[in-house]
């Protein structure tokens, strides 16, 4: 009877280890995840507050975040390697690759909101998704995390988000 409980405990411990440690579960180590090369996320809707665009563009002098808020205010901020690593990790953490190929339109809604997402990875992979009055699972939470990343970046460069019309 004692031996049986030891086996059950060992099995539970092994299962818990697999669940809690992605490396043991066969997931790619953090440094092996594909890095984001370019990024574009845009929204539009019925009011001006919904017209926003967040981009990461590559130039000969490095990468820049290009942020357009309310179809009017534009910000161009240089990105460090640390910023890019953090953003690449965020894209992986959010599981945005699951959205690749999502292109849905609800034609019964005459006015509403839409989005587009385009990501290019250093390894050649890509994400292309869009929706008009249709959104993939977990949309609100995931795009909030994306906006938070760019707003934090703006704060680090000294932009007072309370002074912006958000």
Predicted features and spans:
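Short, well-ordered, aromatic-rich surface patches in folded extracellular/luminal domains
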Residues: 28-46, 90, 97-166
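N-terminal export/targeting and maturation segments
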Residues: 25-66, 78
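Residues that act as N-cap/strand-start positions at coil-to-secondary-structure junctions
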Residues: 48-50, 71, 111
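Short amphipathic beta-strand/extended segments with alternating polar/hydrophobic composition
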Residues: 51-57, 75-79, 124-135
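Generic recognition of cysteine residues
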Residues: 19-23, 47, 134
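A short-motif feature that recognizes glycine-rich, charge-decorated loops
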Residues: 64-99
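Gram-positive cell-envelope targeting signals
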Residues: 1-30, 117
């Amino acid at each position: 009877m004692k031996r049986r409980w030891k086996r059950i405990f060992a099995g539970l411990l092994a299962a818990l280890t697999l669940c809690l440690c992605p490396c043991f579960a066969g997931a790619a180590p953090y440094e092996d995840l594909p890095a984001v090369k370019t990024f574009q996320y845009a929204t539009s809707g019925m009011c001006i507050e919904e017209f926003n665009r967040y981009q990461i563009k590559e130039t000969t002098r490095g990468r820049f975040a290009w942020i357009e808020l309310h179809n009017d205010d534009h910000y161009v901020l240089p990105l460090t390697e640390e910023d890019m690593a953090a953003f690449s990790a965020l894209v992986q953490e959010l599981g945005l690759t699951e959205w690749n190929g999502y292109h849905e339109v609800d034609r019964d809604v005459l006015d509403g909101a839409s989005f587009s997402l385009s990501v290019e990875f250093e390894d050649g992979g890509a994400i292309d998704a869009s929706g008009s009055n249709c959104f993939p699972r977990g949309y609100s939470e995931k795009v909030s995390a994306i906006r938070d990343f760019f707003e934090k970046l703006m704060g680090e460069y000294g932009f007072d988000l309370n002074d912006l019309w958000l």
